[in-house]
From Swiss-Prot:
Changing N44I: Changed the substrate specificity of the transporter from zinc to iron. A motif (Histidine repeat 1) lies at residues 141-145. This is Vacuolar zinc transporter ZRC1. Residues 141-170, 208-227, 391-419 are annotated as: Disordered. It comes from Saccharomyces cerevisiae (strain ATCC 204508 / S288c) (Baker's yeast). Belongs to the cation diffusion facilitator (CDF) transporter (TC 2.A.4) family. SLC30A subfamily. InterPro entries: Cation_efflux (IPR002524), Cation_efflux_CTD_sf (IPR036837), Cation_efflux_TMD_sf (IPR027469). GO terms for biological process: intracellular zinc ion homeostasis; response to cadmium ion; zinc ion transmembrane transport. Contains 3 histidine repeat motifs between the 4th and 5th transmembrane, exposed to the cytoplasm, that may be involved in the binding site of zinc.
Length: 442
């Protein structure tokens, strides 16, 4: 069944195809570079709409499998990056042609026809703006952490895919801990009974509470694109750029048609350069945002340092390492972290609950926490290896380095960090007991 998003894309695709053929034909007939530039922008819109249609289709119809364990949730992100790259390439080609026209201006034949086509193109783009206007503005995300406020998510599968589950796994075991079992007293909360269970808590409704933590109540105002599609936002930028380009075409055609200045033909390449700037100013931020997601950068709305400090303040946690936070899509955040614990395994349950609570408070509802239990006699050694502790002050580990960053043996050594492997050889971090020395084993 065709969704509302697909119907809008198909409608705009049909309209753009008609006007692309019209603009490129009239543009070459009248030698109007502005109209030709706008027609190629329209062609890129057609390509981007095809990519958007494909992205929506695969995101809706292709679920996770053995080959793609996350499914095709990033299909629209990839489509947005392709759109942006095409636009940036188009900018350079138009700019070169416009500079040539500034050196050797060409006479624009039949500017009145160019004007009519520009007006018709503007009307078509106004229709496109009405189709996609919901995707053009950043939404403010404000909520109390007892619940998540429902937003208007245009893609049905995205609201279904927004879920909450955290895994706390013991070394040698890929087993999830049931949060309810952790919080419940008595025998059901014992580690031997909850480790065999693998429970994923999914949100059936976005307005349901994520986790009961009444002691933490504050609001966020951030430009979090959680309720809109990055690729659909890219389509909106295409349409907006086209509309502004049509206004430039109309202005240049009127100026050439109604004036007799000898330099009036310079208005055509000048308008073309303005169109190029408009396209580039929308394409570059889009490419950066899509690239950050595909490169698994830390989301701009999340402070990894703050999360780390809060986790280090949890009782029993002495150090953290291999901490990663990234976007799966614009609205789904994922995190993984290794936590070194100085308590017994059966006491880890309360710490795991607090750690998951911290992730929930920061909007991360899919997290993997791997505990590493250490005995008391090596706690002090571990503390010396980490320079970041709760509160953000440097630990005693810095005493092992001189002012030049050398160790007591005179060798250069990188200060430990929570965001990478704790050993210089980057050994396997799945399980220290197996003594894996493969450098790329993560």
């Amino acid at each position: 069944m065709i969704t509302g998003k697909e119907l809008r894309i198909i409608s705009l695709l049909t309209l753009d195809t008609v006007f692309f053929l019209l603009e490129i034909t009239i543009g070459y007939m009248s030698h109007s570079l502005a109209l030709i530039a706008d027609s190629f922008h329209m062609l890129n819109d057609i390509i981007s709409l095809l990519v958007a249609l494909w992205a929506v289709d695969v995101a809706k119809n292709r679920g996770p499998d053995a080959k793609y364990t996350y499914g095709w949730k990033r299909a629209e992100i990839l489509g947005a990056l392709i759109n942006a790259v095409f636009l940036i390439a188009l900018c350079f080609s138009i700019m070169i042609e416009a500079l040539q026209r500034l050196i050797e201006p060409q006479e624009i034949q039949n500017p009145r026809l160019v004007l009519y086509v520009g007006v018709a193109g503007l009307i078509s783009n106004v229709v496109g703006l009405f189709l996609f206007h919901d995707h053009g503005s950043d939404s403010l995300h404000s909520h109390s952490h007892g619940s998540v406020e429902s937003g208007n998510n245009d893609l049905d599968i995205e609201s279904n895919a927004t879920h909450s589950h955290s895994h706390a796994s013991l070394p040698n075991d890929n087993l999830a801990i049931d949060e309810d079992a952790i919080s419940s007293p008595g025998p059901s909360g014992q580690i031997g009974e909850v480790l065999p269970q693998s429970v994923v808590n999914r949100l059936s409704n976005e307005s349901q509470p994520l986790l009961n933590h009444d002691d933490h109540d504050h609001s966020h105002e951030s430009k979090k694109p959680g309720h809109r599609s990055l690729n659909m936002h890219g389509v909106f930028l295409h349409v907006l750029g086209d509309a502004l380009g049509n206004i430039g075409v109309i202005a240049a055609a009127l100026f050439i048609w109604k004036t007799e200045y000898s330099w009036r033909y310079y208005s055509d390449p000048i308008v073309s350069l303005i169109i190029t700037i408009i396209i580039f100013s929308s394409a570059l931020p889009l490419s950066r945002r899509a690239s950050r997601i595909l490169l698994q950068a830390t989301p701009s709305t999340i402070s990894a340092d703050q999360i780390q400090r809060e986790i280090l303040a949890v009782p029993g946690v002495i150090a953290v390492h291999d901490f990663h936070v990234w976007n799966l899509t614009e609205s789904i955040y994922i995190a993984s972290i290794h936590v070194q614990i100085d308590c017994a395994p059966d006491k880890f349950m309360s710490s795991a609950k607090l750690i998951r609570k911290i992730f929930h408070q920061h909007g991360i509802h899919s997290a993997t926490v791997q505990p590493e239990f250490v005995s008391g006699d090596v706690n002090e050694d571990i503390r010396r290896r980490f320079s970041i502790i709760a509160g953000g002050s440097p630990s005693s580990s810095q005493e092992a380095f001189d002012s030049h960053g050398n160790t007591e043996h005179g060798r250069k050594k990188r200060s430990p960090t929570a965001y990478g492997a704790t050993t210089a050889s980057s050994n396997c971090i799945v399980d220290d007991a197996v003594n894996c020395n493969t450098s790329n084993c993560l």
